[in-house]
A protein has these predicted regions:
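Short, solvent-exposed recognition patches
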Residues: 48-146, 150-151
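Generic alpha-helical propensity signal that fires on short helical segments
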Residues: 19, 106-111, 117, 177, ...
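A short, solvent-exposed beta-edge/loop patch
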Residues: 124-194
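Sec-dependent bacterial lipoprotein signal peptides
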Residues: 1-24
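Second-shell loop/turn segments in exported
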Residues: 34-38, 86-92, 163-171
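N-terminal "mature-domain start" segment
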Residues: 27-80, 178-194
């Protein structure tokens, strides 16, 4: 009888963990539903002041000569944690359709695993140093060789929101999309479900 009770008890514990794990996994699937689409027109026109109003810190203003159709472009950083802010490149266009039609090719060129980071090969080389991330051994000492490559892409993806293209860092596409969405949600707060 005691053996039956202990087996039943273990089965109950196992069932609890399976149920809990399933509930957590299903809840995680719904998080994508709340994300702002990668290309989205909320029907408004943005400026750098809209980003600064939510805590975006502008580091550099880029010369947009050669950046097809863009009104202006900036390099800066943002994050909900002031000690863990991430880098972004922001490009503003006259309209949402201009951002899509004129800005997509150069955003593709600047982001992702196949980003073009050689100044001589880029269609718009402005800010190329800011678009690179250094990886490798940068230390010194008996084991270190001090070899470091600064040819890795910093921006892994982008969002086109209103008249803005937002290039986002992150180390991989999934993280970059999360970082894009995090910033965009401060501009476009979630509406409550009714």
């Amino acid at each position: 009888m005691n053996r039956f009770i202990s087996i039943s008890f273990l089965s109950l514990i196992a069932l609890t963990f399976v149920t809990l794990g399933t509930a957590i996994a299903c809840d995680g699937e719904n998080s994508d539903e709340a994300a702002i689409p990668r290309i989205y027109d909320p029907g408004k026109k943005l400026t750098i002041e809209d980003l600064q109003a939510v805590g975006f810190k502008k580091s550099k203003t880029y010369d947009v000569e050669g950046l097809v159709g863009a009104d202006n472009a900036y390099y800066g950083f943002w994050g909900p944690d002031p000690y863990d802010r991430k880098d972004y490149e922001v490009r503003f266009f006259p309209s949402h359709s201009d951002a899509i039609e004129l800005g997509t090719a150069q955003a593709d060129e600047r982001s992702g695993e196949d980003a073009i980071l050689d100044k001589d090969l880029m269609s718009w080389p402005e800010g190329v140093k800011d678009a690179r991330e250094c990886k490798g051994d940068k230390g010194s000492g008996p084991v270190s060789h001090g070899v470091q490559s600064c040819k890795s892409p910093k921006y892994w993806d982008y969002s086109i929101y209103a008249n803005m293209i937002l290039l986002c860092s992150g180390g991989d596409i999934e993280t970059a999309r999360i970082l894009c969405n995090d910033l965009l949600e401060t501009i476009e707060p979630k509406t409550s479900d009714n």
